[in-house]
């Protein structure tokens, strides 16, 4: 059974809005912002794979693999930065890091 493209795009849209809400509502917590960004990127991957399945090409799968590689690098760098900031300021609240003092 093949899932219609409309259902895939609706699910991708719901996931994207959920990630956007997660990013906007919990703007103070850096980890929750990262989770929201990851949910939005996963929604984009789902839309690419669904569209590629609809038109019978492999471009969506290739692009989703590139997004996976990019997000793994992004998560590793961002979590290393969060650990460093937590050791430095003892918090992961984004509002505490708005000063540019040295």
UniProtKB/Swiss-Prot annotation:
Which Gene3D superfamilies does the record cross-reference, listed alphabetically?
Answer: 1.10.287.3510
This entry carries the following GO cellular component terms, namely: NADH dehydrogenase complex; plasma membrane
Principal location class = membrane
Return the Pfam families for the record. Oxidored_q2
Q: What is the lineage of its organism?
A: Bacteria, Pseudomonadati, Thermodesulfobacteriota, Desulfuromonadia, Geobacterales
Quaternary structure, from the entry: NDH-1 is composed of 14 different subunits. Subunits NuoA, H, J, K, L, M, N constitute the membrane sector of the complex.
Q: How does it sit in the membrane?
A: Multi-pass membrane protein
Keywords, comma-separated and alphabetical: Cell inner membrane, Cell membrane, Membrane, NAD, Quinone, Translocase, Transmembrane, Transmembrane helix, Transport, Ubiquinone
Give the EC class as a word: translocase
Family that this chain belongs to: Belongs to the complex I subunit 4L family.
Which InterPro entries does the record match to this protein? NADH_UbQ_OxRdtase_chain4L/K (IPR001133), NUOK/Mnh_C1-like (IPR039428)
The entry's localization annotation reads: Cell inner membrane
According to its UniProt record, which reaction does this protein catalyse? a quinone + NADH + 5 H(+)(in) = a quinol + NAD(+) + 4 H(+)(out)
Q: Which domain of life is it from?
A: Bacteria
List the transmembrane segments. 1-21, 30-50, 65-85
- Can you name one GO molecular function term for this protein? NADH:ubiquinone reductase (non-electrogenic) activity
Question: What EC number(s) does this enzyme carry?
Answer: 7.1.1.-
Give the protein's recorded name. NADH-quinone oxidoreductase subunit K 2
Role, per record: NDH-1 shuttles electrons from NADH, via FMN and iron-sulfur (Fe-S) centers, to quinones in the respiratory chain. The immediate electron acceptor for the enzyme in this species is believed to be ubiquinone. Couples the redox reaction to proton translocation (for every two electrons transferred, four hydrogen ions are translocated across the cytoplasmic membrane), and thus conserves the redox energy in a proton gradient.
Q: Which NCBIfam families match?
A: PRK05715.1-2
Query: Single Gene Ontology BP term?
Result: ATP synthesis coupled electron transport
């Amino acid at each position: 059974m093949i899932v219609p493209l409309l259902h895939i795009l609706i699910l991708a849209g719901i996931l994207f809005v959920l990630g956007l809400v997660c990013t906007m509502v919990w703007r103070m917590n850096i980890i929750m912002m990262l989770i929201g960004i990851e949910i939005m990127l996963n929604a984009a991957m789902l839309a690419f794979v669904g569209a590629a399945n609809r038109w019978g090409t492999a471009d969506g799968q290739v692009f989703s693999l590139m997004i996976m590689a990019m997000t793994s690098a992004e998560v590793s760098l961002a979590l290393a930065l969060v650990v460093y900031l937590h050791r430095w300021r003892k918090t992961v609240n984004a509002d505490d890091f708005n000063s540019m003092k040295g």
